[in-house]
């Protein structure tokens, strides 16, 4: 007998934008389709609507761009992945993507990113910071326009 697929989504804040509502919808969709669904965010208005019987919600400061906080998030996400035996780590923004990327290396789990918007690639520092969104095992483009942007 196979076990349920366990998917962890990580997004900075769960507001009412397209990325956030998509994350919220996918979290509940996964449960409805025989998967275990986990969600890490730093809060937001949509968190009060999470069905806690369907989605395991964990609050962490994944909205932070502070490198020390991002490193702490890496450790905490790794512990969560090991504890719940998560199969896939799905990052939906750059700051948490760095923590998720490192956690995926530590835990040897699959890493997925979703590109929701365009990013400025002008400076070398920004280009490196943004590059995490393309370092995953699978990159999801939110639209054809975004797909063209990242090609």
Where are these regions (language model features)?
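Membrane-interface segments of envelope glycosyltransferases acting on lipid-linked substrates or membrane lipids
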Residues: 1-151
